[in-house]
């Protein structure tokens, strides 16, 4: 669904003028008063009335032909493509808008086409190296507890009240972001929570988007690769751009490089700080305690009339690292007008798909934790919090590493996991164009000498082997054995070659296999 229900109609002429005013327009042809009702950049999903963006290094004229056949009324391209695309404009009668940068145009035009849906929907953006998804789900859970509906754009799922699907990249391209916000307005959702990746900030996917609240969780050295960000500086600067058009900035005082983050956040109209054991923060937590697979803490700074002890908050999710995520969600909720009762209820009833999902065997001997952890920071927090919750338990970890990106993980992950693991099983995980066996061998090469490990490529066989080992080899009569299934969470797609192939999720495998006690 592309179409906004409002009275204002955007025309090709309006878009040409907007590009011109912003100094982006180089040339235009066949501009007139035709209505533009949507935006697209993928020739396979074009609706009649769309403006089509010709983007990408490998753009072919055939893509534009498809878009025009599907009813696109105008297209935007850079000068390098004019020679090959101009004949198509002549032939079809579509308007051609030639710009300096298609990326900039993709950030400028959609808000106009969809008639500024951000005026009717409160938008919260969350960035950080780890915790974005959890914080986003926490905030969504709080908003639902307050009786409101809330849209979500994130790495696990995207749901705007009209479209709902499993995501393949954290932040979609600008035209999609704006379509989702427009869908929120159409379906009556008052707010939208967005995970904002550094890639999205770098490539202008949210450049023109005014965040009501922009949250900064943390910064780590994870996404440094030739494909993503060549240097830490590039990555960090990209992340800081979330504050460029924020009304309120929320900053975790526990992040590395906090002074630079606060300096960047000072451009916002209002600054809210959070922190664990940071009494100088606007909202802070003290006395964090683990209660089984839940967490309690005392919250300070939320209510003017609170007692010395603060408000007691219960988080229905394990991992004390989640307290920072909760504080960000609490701060954002307060900024969009949600009270303490809904905050408490939303956090206690929380479920985050694929994050610290606990599956327990009927006889209590095996506890499986399914988690999306797939980088150094998230491995470190996950393993240390499992060890704190179950100090006497043997631990078996099943994981791999994604193909074609972040090479350094193949060294880091086994090193992070080894001190806590009794057995590591390396399995296939989103190999893309690499040989999964090669990836697993590289992981195995970096295991410190004394930690048992094996390679079982097939994920189902690996999970089966982990449960068998948990019952037969790695047993402590006084404590359950913990099996960690890492990286895939509840995802039902595996990235193989150029395809996303359907698979059974780790969560489903855990539920199906945990009570098997007879092994051949």
Residue ranges and their predicted role:
Residues 57-58, 198-199, 220-223, 255-256, ...:
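Short glycine-rich anion-binding loops that position phosphate/pyrophosphate groups of nucleotides
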Residues 69, 73-79, 249-253, 396-399, ...:
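Short internal beta-strands
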Residues 56-59, 352, 384-449, 458-459, ...:
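Active-site beta-alpha connecting loops in nucleotide-dependent enzymes
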Residues 62-63, 203, 224-231, 406-408, ...:
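Glycine/threonine-rich flexible loop motifs
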Residues 83-89, 186-187, 202, 212-368, ...:
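Acidic, Mg2+-coordinating active-site environments of NTP-dependent enzymes
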Residues 104-253, 257-269, 390:
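Phosphate-binding loop of NTP-binding sites
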Residues 224, 501-520:
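Short, flexible loop segments at boundaries between secondary-structure elements
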Residues 1-108, 284, 314, 318-320, ...:
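N-terminal leader/targeting and accessory segments in enzymes
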């Amino acid at each position: 669904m592309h179409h906004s229900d409002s009275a204002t109609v955007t025309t090709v002429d309006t878009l040409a003028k907007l590009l011109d005013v912003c100094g982006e327009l180089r040339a235009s042809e066949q501009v007139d008063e035709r209505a533009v009702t949507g935006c697209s950049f993928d020739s396979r999903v074009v609706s009649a009335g769309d403006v089509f963006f010709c983007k990408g290094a490998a753009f072919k004229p055939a893509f534009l032909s498809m878009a025009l056949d599907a009813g696109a009324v105008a297209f935007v391209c850079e000068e390098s493509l004019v020679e090959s695309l101009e004949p198509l404009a002549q032939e079809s009668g579509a308007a051609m808008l030639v710009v300096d940068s298609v990326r900039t145009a993709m950030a400028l035009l959609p808000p106009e086409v969809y008639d500024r849906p951000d005026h009717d929907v409160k938008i919260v953006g969350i960035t950080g190296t780890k915790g974005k998804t959890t914080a986003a789900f926490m905030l969504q859970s709080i908003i639902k507890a307050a009786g409101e509906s809330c849209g979500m754009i994130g790495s696990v799922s995207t749901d705007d009240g009209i479209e709902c699907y499993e995501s393949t990249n954290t932040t979609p391209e600008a035209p999609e972001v704006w379509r989702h916000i427009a869908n929120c307005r159409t379906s009556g959702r008052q707010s939208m929570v967005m995970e904002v990746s550094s890639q999205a900030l770098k490539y202008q996917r949210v450049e023109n988007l005014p965040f009501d609240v922009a949250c900064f969780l943390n910064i780590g050295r994870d996404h440094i690769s030739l494909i993503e960000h060549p240097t830490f500086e590039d990555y960090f600067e990209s992340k800081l751009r979330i504050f460029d058009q924020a009304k309120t900035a929320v900053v975790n005082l526990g992040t590395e490089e906090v002074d630079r983050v606060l300096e960047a956040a000072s451009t916002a109209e209002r600054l809210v700080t959070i922190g664990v054991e940071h009494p100088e923060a606007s909202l802070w937590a003290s006395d964090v305690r683990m209660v089984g697979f839940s967490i309690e803490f005392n919250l300070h700074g939320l209510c003017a009339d609170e007692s010395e002890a603060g408000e007691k908050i219960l988080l229905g999710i394990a991992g004390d690292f989640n307290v920072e995520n909760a504080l960000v969600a609490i701060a954002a909720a307060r900024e969009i007008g949600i009270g303490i009762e809904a905050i408490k209820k939303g956090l206690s009833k929380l479920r985050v798909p694929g994050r610290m999902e606990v599956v327990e065997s009927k006889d209590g001997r095996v506890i499986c934790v399914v988690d999306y952890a797939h980088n150094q920071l998230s491995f470190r927090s996950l393993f240390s919090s499992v060890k704190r919750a179950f100090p006497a338990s043997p631990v078996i970890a099943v994981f791999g590493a994604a193909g074609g990106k972040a090479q350094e993980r193949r060294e880091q992950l086994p090193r992070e996991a080894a001190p806590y693991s009794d057995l590591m099983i390396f399995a296939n995980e989103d190999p893309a164009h690499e040989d999964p066996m090669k990836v697993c061998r590289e992981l195995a090469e970096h295991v410190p000498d004394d930690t048992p490990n094996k390679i079982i490529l097939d994920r189902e066989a690996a999970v089966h082997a982990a449960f068998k080992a948990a019952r037969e080899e790695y047993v402590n009569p006084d404590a359950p054995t913990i099996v960690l299934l890492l990286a895939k969470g509840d995802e039902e797609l595996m990235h193989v070659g150029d395809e996303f192939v359907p698979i059974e999720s780790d969560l489903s495998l855990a539920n199906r296999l945990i009570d098997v006690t007879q092994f051949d």
